[in-house]
Amino acid sequence: MYSISFQEESLLPRERLVRLGAEQLSNQELLSILIRTGNKKENVFQIASKILSSVSSLTELRHMTLSELQGMSGIGQVKAIELQAMIELGSRISKAENFEGERILSSQKLAKKMQQELSHKKQEHLVALYLNTQNQIIHQQTIFIGSLTRSLAEPREILHYAIKHMATSIILVHNHPSGATRPSRDDDQVTEKIKEACEMMGFVLLDHLIVGGDSYYSYREETDLI
């Protein structure tokens, strides 16, 4: 007589998490929990190990596209979607911890933070930061992703979040994937259009930053538009 015992592949890391806490688990163990199961060729620990060995750092994993995740051994479409959702949620939590409640003292300091967030993006991202009367960030919102043109950057959505979060002022930030930070004519027109809309609604447009690579451009510092 013999018996066959079956233990779910990722059960041990789950037990360790319950017993010791998530902070005590290795990156491989945490990733194994998220992946959940292996396949016919590899168990979940081997898949997690391969994924981690294919990137130079966890930051690189955060920047991977859905198709790049799905192209990894043992990762199908569903797991790739789940991983990207988890990565994005973690990124948003980190941004909330780093920004919300922080007082903005200079365009340079803010630009350095936004460079870390946006400089690696392959498309333009327009982000609005909403501040209270103490110049503390109370909300951050990605307005849209794509080329920044006057027709796309409608003030309506930007002001919607200002009203929703009871902000008193707004800072716009967008990236140039090329790395060049000099504003285009479209950038100037968008800035002027949104400034006028803010003034009509009683909000202050404090700045519009353009970030790319290791440099930035501040409309407040460089022009009289703001």
Swiss-Prot record:
The keyword Zinc applies. PANTHER family: DNA REPAIR PROTEIN RADC, UPF0758 PROTEIN YEES-RELATED. One of its GO terms (molecular function) is metal ion binding. InterPro entries: MPN (IPR037518), RadC_JAB (IPR025657), UPF0758 (IPR001405), UPF0758_CS (IPR020891), UPF0758_N (IPR046778). A motif (JAMM motif) lies at residues 174-187. Pfam families: RadC, UPF0758_N. Keywords: Hydrolase, Metal-binding, Metalloprotease, Protease, Zinc. GO terms for biological process: proteolysis. PROSITE patterns: MPN, UPF0758. The keyword Thylakoid does not apply. This is UPF0758 protein SGO_1229. Zn(2+) binds at H174, H176, D187. Residues 103-225 form the MPN domain. Belongs to the UPF0758 family. Gene3D superfamilies: Cytidine Deaminase, domain 2.
